[in-house]
């Protein structure tokens, strides 16, 4: 039966007990990590959020010793005892490895059943089981450390931004649904039957309205929601570090955020981030890396060989060029002897990313070539191609030929795959960069129209405003993303603050004047009353902390994450609700054809 802790007051957390306390009486509380019964002595590893402290029970203590025999993993206990230097071997792996507490008083505050998995880091437990018993999983030291790191990050950001003049303001979570972007999570209104709120995908419009309201610098640690397919770095509910600034341009936003990141990484990780961070245009990022979030910790950059092969005899290359495409390649240094089976796997990978195929050329150590297309080209053409690729004996050259979008996607993905396989990435590097000058619009084959690459409120570059009426594909945006080691940490833009440009932007995206005012009338009305130039940025907090913690999945830095089908294995959400609730909301559940069958 559980005992009360009445009369006991914790004097220290586990790792707060140190050599300085030798000879003193302490009161500590926590969970039983491990029990070792040596006959006349029982050793208990006591665990709390800070770490492990060794407790010792001696058979000479009679009643306390007998009670200690009952202890099992995950029992919650409170003890009083004296700190002493360890008699036996010192445990260098523990902060408290050279001391122990000889226990005089033991209270069992709560017993535990045998947990479904050991509460320790080095255990091979299925992730679904970990998430089902997340409250146990969260006791593990790594997750304790990760969530403490997350807390440290948000605390630092709030303090730094407050000193920079930012005001923290909360924006609504019950919002108006808008059609652009990912699917909304909808919330039915009981008071307005048949009408719905949307949970915010971001506080975008509200933070712009705060600039209209004169708050100058806004920040919020904001919860956001998107009903989209999950990946390793995506969740249906996530957290943004959201900010907006008035009377600024791109350089001002970049400056404050570079200083924030530099100070935060130094304070929390003791990592020096050099400033200024590199900047490259979106076009340069795609041409060099095949990605708008390039990992610059290694080379293997894309090379455009279109001009070199445009008149060659290989129809795959020339055909792609004649259809308005390009031919690009990557040089995989020192892999010219790669077995054909591995090359075939690369070809399959390329096809999986949209390629019709993948051409390769191996440069043998004697300078001769082994290639899938050598017979279609003259020796001079091959030599020129190898020269353009800076090929040397022992190298493997890979080529894709198609529309730019496909070639970038194929070679960008291959570049990352090969870098991981060949262990080319220095995991100790923190390579930040800014990608700027994004296209304002991108063509959607599915919708057969231009859509906003970022969102409809991004300001075009002034010199490209003329193309809003003539050629949307030429319009560049005053948009910027911050990238770390191949992951987009955040993105932002200078916003449109003139009503006429905003209306023209919405018109270019296919909104009628009536639709624009129905969806965004409150913003367009605000533009009638004096709007400062403004810009902003939002970080994905989960992704940022994931990188800082050295994790590969954001679920490892979120207390209660969802799985890939957006469900919670611990609470079984989402779940059916009773008919009375549905009636109050005037909702009928329509069964799909498969359910009816």
Feature-to-residue mapping (PLM):
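Class II aminoacyl-tRNA synthetase catalytic cores and aaRS-like
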Residues: 1-597
């Amino acid at each position: 039966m559980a005992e009360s802790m009445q009369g006991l007051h914790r004097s220290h957390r586990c790792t707060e007990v140190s050599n300085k306390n030798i000879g003193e009486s302490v009161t500590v509380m926590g969970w039983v990590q491990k029990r070792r019964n040596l006959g006349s002595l029982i050793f208990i590893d006591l665990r709390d959020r800070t770490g492990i402290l060794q407790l010792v029970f001696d058979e000479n203590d009679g009643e306390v010793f007998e009670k200690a025999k009952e202890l099992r993993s995950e029992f919650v206990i409170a003890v009083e005892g004296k700190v002493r230097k360890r008699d036996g071997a010192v445990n260098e792996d523990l902060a408290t490895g050279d001391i122990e507490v000889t226990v005089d008083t033991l209270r069992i505050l709560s017993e535990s059943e045998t947990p479904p998995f050991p509460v320790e880091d080095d255990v091979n437990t299925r992730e679904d089981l970990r998430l089902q018993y997340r409250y146990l999983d969260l006791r593990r030291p790594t997750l304790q450390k990760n969530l403490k790191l997350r807390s440290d990050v948000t605390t630092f950001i709030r303090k730094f931004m407050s000193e920079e003049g930012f005001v923290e303001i909360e924006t609504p979570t019950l919002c108006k649904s808008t059609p652009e972007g990912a699917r909304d999570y909808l919330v039915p209104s009981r008071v307005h039957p048949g009408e719905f709120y949307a949970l915010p995908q971001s506080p975008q419009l509200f933070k712009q309205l705060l600039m209209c309201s004169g708050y100058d610098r806004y920040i919020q640690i904001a919860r956001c929601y998107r009903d989209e397919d999950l990946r390793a770095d995506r969740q249906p509910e996530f957290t943004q570090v959201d900010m907006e600034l008035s009377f600024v341009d791109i350089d001002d936003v970049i400056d404050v955020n570079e200083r924030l990141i530099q100070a935060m990484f130094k304070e929390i990780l003791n990592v020096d981030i050099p400033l200024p961070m590199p900047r490259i245009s979106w076009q340069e990022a795609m041409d060099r890396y095949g990605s708008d979030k390039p990992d610059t910790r290694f080379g293997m950059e894309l090379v455009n060989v279109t001009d070199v092969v445009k008149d060659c005899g290989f129809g795959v290359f020339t055909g792609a060029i004649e259809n308005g495409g390009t031919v690009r390649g990557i040089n995989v240094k020192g892999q010219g002897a790669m077995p054909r089976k591995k090359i075939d796997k690369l070809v399959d990978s390329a096809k999986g990313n949209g390629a019709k195929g993948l051409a390769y050329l191996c440069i043998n150590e004697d300078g001769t070539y082994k290639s899938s297309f050598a017979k279609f080209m003259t020796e001079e053409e091959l030599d020129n191609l190898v020269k353009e690729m800076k090929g040397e004996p022992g190298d493997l050259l890979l080529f894709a030929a198609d529309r730019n979008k496909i070639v970038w996607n194929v070679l960008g993905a291959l570049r990352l795959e090969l870098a991981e396989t060949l262990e080319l990435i220095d995991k100790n590097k923190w390579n930040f960069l800014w990608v700027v000058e994004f296209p304002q619009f991108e063509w959607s084959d599915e919708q057969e129209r231009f859509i906003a690459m970022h969102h409809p409120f991004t300001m075009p570059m002034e010199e490209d405003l003329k193309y809003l009426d003539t050629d949307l594909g030429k319009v560049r945006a005053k948009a910027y993303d911050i990238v770390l080691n191949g992951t987009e940490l955040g993105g932002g833009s200078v916003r449109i603050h003139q009503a006429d440009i905003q209306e023209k932007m919405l018109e270019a995206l296919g909104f009628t004047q009536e639709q624009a005012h129905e969806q965004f009338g409150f913003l367009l009305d605000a533009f009638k009353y004096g709007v400062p130039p403004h810009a902003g940025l939002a970080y994905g907090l989960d992704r940022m902390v994931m990188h800082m913690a050295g994790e590969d999945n954001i679920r490892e830095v979120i207390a209660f994450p969802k799985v890939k089908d957006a469900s919670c294995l611990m609470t079984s959400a989402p779940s059916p609700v009773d008919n009375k609730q549905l009636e109050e909301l005037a909702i009928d559940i329509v069964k799909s054809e498969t359910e009816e069958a």
